Regions:
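Axial heme c-ligation environment in periplasmic c-type cytochrome domains
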Residues: 26, 76-83, 103-134
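Gly/Gly-Pro-rich "capping" loops immediately C-terminal to redox-active cysteine motifs
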Residues: 42-49, 69-97
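Sec/Tat signal peptide C-region and signal peptidase I cleavage site
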Residues: 20-26
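Positively charged n-region of N-terminal signal peptides that target proteins for export
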Residues: 1-6
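Electrostatic cytochrome c docking/interface patches
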Residues: 28-55
Length: 137
């Protein structure tokens, strides 16, 4: 029995490290070197934020919720869409990284499809501006 317990400890430690890594990744979906270099070409303005909110309500609310808190009624079973109003979720994510996640999706683990075929680049940048406007300060 002592051997099993001794062999179990490294496996448990490895599992813990994997869990911490996955959790850290979930808190920062970006991490794209390309995204870190991108600059938002759309100035944040009341017009951009309003357009971004409209695009968000049309495309994103079903999973992320009308209030962007991750409580949408149509999220795939077993998934937990991000609370996009939580500044902790956004920590470390640049506008470019958020843009790329919206454009290309986050998956397969996070099960978010990309919207490049449904939204123009300008619409996506407006959504980024909207999300910045609703994040906790």
């Amino acid at each position: 029995m002592g051997r099993v317990s001794t062999a179990f400890v490294p496996a448990l430690a490895l599992s813990f490290v994997a869990l911490v890594s996955v959790t850290a990744r979930a808190q920062n979906p970006g991490g794209s070197p390309e995204g870190k270099k991108m600059k938002n070409p759309v100035a944040s303005s009341p017009e951009s934020i309003k357009a971004g909110q409209a695009a968000f309500q049309k495309n994103c609310r079903f999973c992320h919720g009308a209030d962007a808190k991750g409580n949408g009624p149509m999220a795939p079973e077993g998934t937990h869409p991000s609370n996009l109003t939580d500044d902790k979720w956004d920590r470390g994510s640049t506008d470019g990284e958020i843009f790329l996640v919206i454009q290309n999706g986050a998956g397969p683990k996070f099960d978010m499809k990309g919207y490049k075929s449904k939204m123009t680049d300008n619409e996506i940048w407006n959504v980024v501006n909207y999300l910045r406007s609703v994040q906790a300060k």
